[in-house]
Amino acid sequence: MEIVIKRNDRVLVADVKKQLSDIYMKITWREIANQYFGKSSSWLYHKLDGIDGNGGRGGFTQEELATLKDALVDLSERIHTAADRL
């Protein structure tokens, strides 16, 4: 079940960490935050935990969620390419 929060005409998805539970501990989130978002790892960890910048409830905007999806797809393709070279 996806948790959606509406705030100031923005829709935020707040349960992304749960949706990524099977890979959460395997990913270097610092690199994802820096390379794909241009943000700090703490920013991304807060987003994954459904916390906004002020400590309240928040999450990913639809645009940020699309960026995260693209980052994970890119990473999966790079892993597949590396495996094919073996």
PLM region spans:
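Short, charged recognition helix plus adjacent turn
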Residues: 6, 10, 52, 60, ...
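Short, amphipathic alpha-helical "recognition" segments used to contact nucleic acids or chromatin
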Residues: 8-25
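Terminal non-globular linear segments
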Residues: 17, 21, 76, 80-85
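Alpha-helix C-capping/helix-to-loop hinge sites
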Residues: 23, 30, 51-55
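Short alpha-helical "recognition helix" segments of helix-turn-helix
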Residues: 28-36
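Recognition helix of helix-turn-helix/homeodomain-like DNA-binding domains
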Residues: 40-58
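DNA major-groove recognition helix of helix-turn-helix/homeodomain DNA-binding modules
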Residues: 60-79
